Regions:
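Nucleotide/phosphate-binding catalytic cleft detector across ATP-hydrolyzing
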Residues: 1-142, 152-224
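Conserved Rossmann-like nucleotide-cofactor binding loop
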Residues: 145
């Protein structure tokens, strides 16, 4: 997902990092609206994720998405000429960091200044953690495709690792488990709904009703 935070106001935008392209050239929808089309869009509309494994995989679509969000926000929030901070993973190259920097540079917002900061530091500050102490602070950030695990102390990052496992892998595990145990197929969005609704690191008695396809009968069905 993508979040915009404005000093003094808090989070002013929180949307899925998804874009829908019509006929390979026109932006049809972005953010949560595009995500709702995932697995449902017709053949002439491609729904994709411009960011994969913490880096920009499709710079053109990413720029289109950022431009759209800024256009929607600028009239309400007066973002032109502001100072921008971009949070990026630690384990990416300088070229990949530069791509994030260029996203803001290429908008029409005329930013006063752009800072690229490491995501664990931004996470810790967002949670009001004091990372200036000599005692270590562990921050685990689980994203869609990656998980970043960092230890911070004395105002800096002591150790950080980015592993290629995130929420999407959890969704995949849910899909495979239900398919194996129930002979029932669900989509990625349904798997995410299960994860967000009753997902837990501990065993619970919670349940949820979901729709999908019964592999035995081949018909749409519902299970708990």
């Amino acid at each position: 997902s993508i979040k915009f935070y404005k000093n003094g106001e808090g989070i002013i935008l929180h949307e899925k990092s998804v874009i829908a392209i019509y006929n390979k050239s026109h932006t049809f929808a972005v953010g949560n609206e595009a995500y709702e089309m995932y697995e449902k869009a017709p053949a002439n509309i491609q729904v994709s994720y411009p960011v994969k494994n913490g880096v920009i995989a499709d710079i053109g679509n990413m720029q289109s998405m950022i431009d759209y969000f800024f256009h929607e926000l600028d009239g309400k929030k007066k973002l032109k000429g502001a100072e921008y901070y971009i949070a990026v993973p630690t384990d990416i190259t300088e070229v990949e960091k530069r791509a994030y920097f260029d996203l803001i540079t290429n908008t029409n917002l005329k930013p006063k200044k752009i800072h690229v900061v490491e995501k664990p530091v931004a996470d810790a500050l967002g949670m009001n953690l004091d990372i200036t102490k000599s005692t270590g602070t562990l921050v685990v950030d689980i994203g869609a495709n990656t998980t970043e695990i960092s230890v911070m102390s004395l105002g800096g990052i002591v150790l950080s690792r980015l592993i290629p496992i995130g929420g999407n892998r959890f969704d995949e595990a849910i899909i495979n488990k239900i398919k194996k145990d129930k002979s029932f197929v669900i989509g990625e969005k349904t798997a995410e709904e299960i994860k967000m609704t009753i997902g837990s690191a501990y065993v619970t008695d919670e349940s949820i009703d979901v729709c999908g396809r019964n592999l035995v009968t081949g018909l749409p069905s519902e299970i708990t």
